[in-house]
Amino acid sequence: MDAPVLYAELHLANTQGLRCTSPPSPRQDACWGSGWHRVALKLGCVGLILLLMGLSVLVGFLVQKPPIEKCSVAVQENKTEPTVRSTILECPRDWHLHWNKCLFISQTSRPWAEGLADCSLRGATLLLIGDGKELKLLQDFSKGKGQQFFIGLKYVQEDKVWKWMNGSILNTNLLRITGKNEENSCALISHTEVFSDSCSSDNHWICQKTLKRV
C-alpha cells in the first residue's frame, strides 16, 4: 500500500512543476498589441490632419494665382497703351491727309512769296513732290478743285536750275517744267502739268507738314 501513495505524490509534484513553467497569458499579449494599435491610429490621424492642412494651403494658393496673373496682364496692357497711342498720327484741323503728309489748301490767291510765308507761319513749307505717284494724285486733286497751285519749286537764276525749298535740285526724270526758265519763275501744278509762272502772280498754294504724333 505504501508504493502507490508515493507514486501519486510524485505525479502531483510533476504536474505542479509543469504548471509553474507555463507561458504568459495570451491576454497580456493582446493588451500590449492593442496599445501599439492605438498609438499608430493616433499618429495616422495626425498625419491625415497635416495632409489636409497642406492641401488646403495649396488649393488656396492656386485659387489666388489667376487674379495675380490677370493683374499683371492689365499692368502690361497699361504699360504698352501709351506706346501704342504715341504711334498714332493725325493731321491738324483743316489739314488733309495725303500719304505721310498733311496738306493745307489755301482759300485765297496771293504771290508765291506770300504763300511761302503763310506756310512758314503754320509750321510747314510749300509742297514738295517726292515721286511720280504723288504727282499723279496731286494732279487729280487739282482737277477736282478746278484750280492750279503754287508748290515749293523755284527757278534759281544764278545756278540755272530749278530748286525745291529744301535745297535739292529738281530731278527732270521725275517731272518736267513747261514754260520759261528765267528769273522770278515759280512752279505751279495743274491737273495736266507742272509749269512756270511769274512768282508775282496771284495763285492758290499748297502747304505740307509731317504727320503729328499724339
Curated annotation (Swiss-Prot):
Residues 64-214 are extracellular. Disulfide bonds join C119-C207, C186-C199. It is a single-pass type II membrane protein. SMART domains: CLECT. Keywords: Disulfide bond, Lectin, Membrane, Signal-anchor, Transmembrane, Transmembrane helix. The chain crosses the membrane at residues 43-63. One of its GO terms (biological process) is regulation of natural killer cell mediated cytotoxicity. GO terms for cellular component: cell surface; plasma membrane. Residues 98-208 form the C-type lectin domain. Residues 1-42 are cytoplasmic. PANTHER family: KILLER CELL LECTIN-LIKE RECEPTOR SUBFAMILY B MEMBER 1. This is Killer cell lectin-like receptor subfamily B member 1. The gene is Klrb1.
